[in-house]
Amino acid sequence: MIGTLQSGGVSKSIVNLLNVMDRTTYDVHLLLLDRAGDILSPYLPSDITVHVNREIENLHRGLRGVRALLFTGHLLLAFGSLLRMLMSKISRAWAGRWLAYLMPRFTDLTFDLIIDYGGQQQLYYMVDKLDGKKKITFFHNDYSKWPYYYAADRLYYPKVDQILSISQTCVDVLKAYFPDCKDKISVMQNISSPVLITKQANETVDLPIAPLLLVSLGHIMRRKGTDFSIDAAKILQKNGVEFKWMLVGKVVEKDLIRRIEQEGLADRFVVLGIRSNPYPYIKAADIYVHPARFEGKSIALDEAKILCKPIIVTNFSTVNDQFEDRVNASICEMNGDALADAIIELAANKELRQSYVAYLNAHIVDNSSEVEKLYTFID
């Protein structure tokens, strides 16, 4: 079960997971809560059953969904959805529980294993409304940076068979928040396929031309550090660095695009928006820059590692689960000055860039076997 199949890391992660599952042995179903912005469904295996429900979709679509519910005669659901939007201003946890309550039961099937891949209302819906012999929930981030649903999670985590997260740091944080559940909290990494990523990276795309080509993959928003990128770009431009910076991802905070224009950086940034295949842009870049404020275990960074790019990354709480400073990446402080300094240094230091590339080349890992952790829960 997943919320959307947009361009985010969780969406890409579940697509990768579904592609490596043993579908000759298991009958695999996917409940997709909302098809809005879906760009990854072409990459789903053709032999899985995808379930969608119009009422569930409209409950996830804000005021537009309320209008659709009214138009189709679902007056109580429309009122309930409005109430949920008001509740979310007070408590995301209870708004999430209310949304799960509103979501209709989509099937009477009993599953051997149900996996909630997104948490929050998906977790509550899975526990309360779906029949499964075993139930697993995922949390794809550092819980200390995203504790908004704690009041509800503490009631629902004891009801599932396993709680999975994507790195040891994330697991340790979950155990600190939910000590009574610590024995059923464990690691399952995001799955990234080197073969598939390398193949997709060879597709032809139009690219900007510059002596220094940078790329960042992620939503354009402060959480992903786009403001740090703008600050750094100002410094690079002031220092006479000739560069283009590709931003691949959904524009979430539009004021950041306005700021790019106001700062006179419109000819420096290339805002590409959402791309179903971002890998040619990563492959073409001289440096991959990841300025996020926090992450769980970034699948975008795993992909940049597979493509063996020199990487600059900020020192968010889980960064050491993926990187060692000056071994396989340059790790910098979370501000524009530090980011600019790291870019200038790495762009000028060919030997350092080559050392990162050599290390990454020697440590490419296909972790498709992670899927076997799920099979242990099926009788």
Model-derived regions, located:
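Short hydrophobic beta-strand element within catalytic cores of glycosyltransferases
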Residues: 310-314
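Donor nucleotide-sugar binding/catalytic pocket of nucleotide-sugar-dependent glycosyltransferases
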Residues: 134-140, 144, 158-199
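Conserved acidic donor-binding segment of nucleotide-sugar-dependent glycosyltransferases
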Residues: 325-326, 330-337, 345-350
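Short acidic/histidine- and often glycine-rich active-site loop of Leloir-type glycosyltransferases
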Residues: 303, 315-326, 330-331
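A short, well-ordered alpha-helix in the C-terminal region of glycosyltransferases
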Residues: 237, 338, 345, 352-367, ...
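Aromatic "clamp/platform" in nucleotide-sugar-dependent glycosyltransferases that forms part
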Residues: 274, 293
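A conserved mid-protein helix/loop that constitutes part of the nucleotide-sugar donor-binding site
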Residues: 11-16, 212-235, 247
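Glycosyltransferase donor-sugar binding loop
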Residues: 30-38, 217, 221-223, 244-256
